[in-house]
C-alpha cells in the first residue's frame, strides 16, 4: 500500500476541498484516464483496491499509472473516549483529490479492455468518475 516514507508532522489539519484541481487534468502518460467528477479524500486502501481491480482485468498486460498519492494523515479517537484531551492518533493516509483530476492512466491495451478496467477501478472509489481519452482532455497527441 502507498504510505509516505517520513513526514514532518504526524497530525495535519483537515483543510478545505474547494474548487477544482489546479494540475493533473490532462492524460499525460497513457491513452485513457479515470477522471474524478467530485472532490473527496481517497484512502490508500481504496487506491490499492482500484489498482488490483485494473491489473486483474488487464491480466498483467499494459501499463497503469497512479497519479495520486496519499500524503495526508487522518486521525481517530478511540471508542468511548470523551471529548477534548487533544487530537487523536493517526489512523491512516488519504489523498485529497479535487474534481477533474486524472487519478489513473492506462496504456498498452485495446480500448475496450482499458475502458472496462477503468470502470472496475471507478467502482472501488467513493467518487463519481468519468473515463477520458487522451485527445478529449487536451493531452498531447502523437501527430506533429
Swiss-Prot record:
GO process annotations (BP): translation
Keyword Ribonucleoprotein carried by entry: yes
Keyword hit for Isomerase: no
An MF annotation (GO) of this entry: structural constituent of ribosome
Domain of life: Bacteria
Gene Ontology CC annotation, any one: cytosolic large ribosomal subunit
Keyword entries, A-Z: Ribonucleoprotein, Ribosomal protein, RNA-binding, rRNA-binding, tRNA-binding
UniProt cross-references to InterPro entries, sorted A to Z: Ribosomal_uL16, Ribosomal_uL16_bact-type, Ribosomal_uL16_CS, Ribosomal_uL16_dom, Ribosomal_uL16_sf
Biological role stated in the UniProt entry: Binds 23S rRNA and is also seen to make contacts with the A and possibly P site tRNAs.
Subunit structure: Part of the 50S ribosomal subunit.
Membership in a protein family: Belongs to the universal ribosomal protein uL16 family.
Name of the featured protein: Large ribosomal subunit protein uL16
Organism of provenance: Lactiplantibacillus plantarum (strain ATCC BAA-793 / NCIMB 8826 / WCFS1)
Taxonomic lineage from the root: Bacteria, Bacillati, Bacillota, Bacilli, Lactobacillales
